[in-house]
Amino acid sequence: MRLLQCSMFMFVALLASAASGLGSEIGARTAYALAQAGKLLIIDVRRPSEWEKTGLPTPSVGISLQNSLRKVRRGFPDDVLDAVDGNKDRPIALICASGGRSAWAVGLLQEIGFSRIHDISEGMFGNGKAPGWLAHNLPVAACESC
């Protein structure tokens, strides 16, 4: 019983630290749990062609970092700001295929004042350290606008 209590305490502490903005990286399972609880907005920064192949994490919002030429879209920061209703302190987590673009986008958004932003660094497919959203069998939804 004591082990169960200790495990629950550690889980709650992990969720609290992830939601409070203390760390910049967050695991896919933790991000999913926080998003399900309404404490975190997940933003998928991959391209629509990628969303079409795998679907988007559920729950999440798709806001592509890049245009079709793989250049950073000028409207990306404004689209993220719209997604959080102008609240740069709202907890958000970014995800891409394997952590590269999401890490870059975290830095970009921090530079313009976002304060509670996390990187789901394992991405959809894994990054060599963790298996990724899909390997965890976390839910995805078809892209309706692709």
Give names to the regions the model predicted.
Residues 48:
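Short glycine-rich anion-binding loops that position phosphate/pyrophosphate groups of nucleotides
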Residues 5-17:
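Bacterial N-terminal signal peptides
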Residues 94-96:
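Short, surface-exposed ligand- or partner-binding patches at beta-edge/loop junctions that are enriched
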Residues 17-37, 52-91, 100-146:
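Rhodanese-like catalytic fold shared by cysteine-dependent sulfurtransferases
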